[in-house]
């Protein structure tokens, strides 16, 4: 299951893997001309409609800075034994900021099972520096 506003690499992986995908369509924010956040209730309804789903993929924050409620979505996924992968490419700075300012961190702290972060977008690092963080035991590291 993937949000419609995911990075094109997600769609390439779906195609290359010959996977079946069911889409989560975040509402459009017409005032700003961007997609809004993926709502937890929409994820729950989609997983209820497709109980064979193995993974939910979403982007938070989006390129435009829109955040989804990753903690609630992680709880919904985990209650059903579904892996949550969050593309947090534009949120690699959340962990250091959370530690410094004492606020909730990003998708890792919120319980996502796999989190992709692009350090070169928001942190001082070499071009193309990225992390794939494995969190919990739902995702198989192999």
Predicted regions and their residues:
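Conserved PLP-enzyme active-site core in the AAT-like
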Residues: 1-142
């Amino acid at each position: 299951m993937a949000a419609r506003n995911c990075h094109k690499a997600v769609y390439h992986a779906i195609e290359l893997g010959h996977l079946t995908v069911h889409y989560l369509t975040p509402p459009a924010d017409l005032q700003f001309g961007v997609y809004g956040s993926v709502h937890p209730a929409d994820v729950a309804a989609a997983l209820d409609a497709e109980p064979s789903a193995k993974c939910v993929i979403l982007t938070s924050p989006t390129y435009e800075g829109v955040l989804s409620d990753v903690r609630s979505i992680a709880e919904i996924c985990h209650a059903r034994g579904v892996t949550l992968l969050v593309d947090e490419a534009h949120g690699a700075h959340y962990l250091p900021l959370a530690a410094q300012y004492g606020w909730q961190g990003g998708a890792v702290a919120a319980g996502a099972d796999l989190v992709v972060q692009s350090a070169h977008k928001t942190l001082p690092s070499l071009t193309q520096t990225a992390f794939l963080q494995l969190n919990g035991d739902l995702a198989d590291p192999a």
